[in-house]
From Swiss-Prot:
Keywords: Ribonucleoprotein, Ribosomal protein, RNA-binding, rRNA-binding. It comes from Lactiplantibacillus plantarum (strain ATCC BAA-793 / NCIMB 8826 / WCFS1) (Lactobacillus plantarum). The gene is rpsD. GO terms for cellular component: small ribosomal subunit. InterPro entries: Ribosomal_uS4, Ribosomal_uS4_bac-type, Ribosomal_uS4_CS, Ribosomal_uS4_N, S4_RNA-bd, S4_RNA-bd_sf. NCBIfam families: PRK05327.1, rpsD_bact. This is Small ribosomal subunit protein uS4. Residues 22-48 are annotated as: Disordered. One of the primary rRNA binding proteins, it binds directly to 16S rRNA where it nucleates assembly of the body of the 30S subunit. Residues 93-154 form the S4 RNA-binding domain.
Length: 202
């Protein structure tokens, strides 16, 4: 399955959550496309609820189905901790997500484009693979020639707060993952246990 590249507001309304994190998609019409008000759709089945939760998280991080499933399998091989929580931590450690968390981009989609176009380095070396797994202590930076890009400077200026598990130097436009995040620091609107149940039934 290919990555969705259409308007994020359509998916946000269908899933009932803001993929951009701004809430703008749901401000005017907080119901799915095609519906003309709340309460028109029937109650989801158990499978439907699990599938919906999986789609919410997958769309939030912008992964293809294969990427998402492979990362879930990888999380299952981690011996310590819960499968679902480990999965969410692996999603957080993706380079495109770290660029977003550091405030170098306003959305994960924008962050992925910055990585793809070669604007980002890890420990001084250019990395153009969005799925690159960032380790604690590695330094994620903007390439010197890219530091004046309006999309980056604008994003940094718009940041209100950053997660407690990252640190950022606004002068150098670089930051790092200082520790692995705790579950309560990750997406509160996601029930990862439903995603584990979904894949366990396949």
């Amino acid at each position: 399955m290919s990555r969705y590249t259409g308007p994020s507001w359509k998916i946000s309304r269908r899933l009932g959550m803001s993929l951009s994190g701004t809430g703008k998609e749901l401000a005017r019409r907080p119901y799915a496309p095609g519906d003309h008000g709340q309460g028109r759709r029937g109650k989801l089945s158990e499978y439907g609820t699990q599938l919906r939760e999986k789609q919410k998280l997958r769309m939030m991080y912008g992964l293809t189905e294969r990427q998402f499933a492979n990362l879930f399998i990888k999380a299952g091989k981690i011996r310590e901790g819960k499968h679902g929580v480990n999965f969410m931590i692996l999603l957080e450690r993706r380079l495109d997500n770290m660029v977003y968390r550091l405030g170098l981009a306003t959305t994960r989609r924008q962050a992925r484009q910055l990585v793809n176009h070669g604007h980002i380095t890890v420990d001084g070396k250019r990395v153009d693979i969005p799925s690159y797994e960032v380790s604690v202590g590695q330094v994620v930076s903007v390439r010197e020639k890219s530091k004046k890009l309006a999309v980056i400077t604008g994003a940094v200026e718009a940041v209100v707060a950053r997660p407690n598990f990252v640190q950022f130097d606004a002068d150098k436009l670089e930051g790092s993952l200082t520790r692995l995040p705790e579950r309560e620091e990750l997406e509160a609107d996601i029930d990862e246990s439903l995603i584990v149940e979904y894949y366990n039934k396949l």
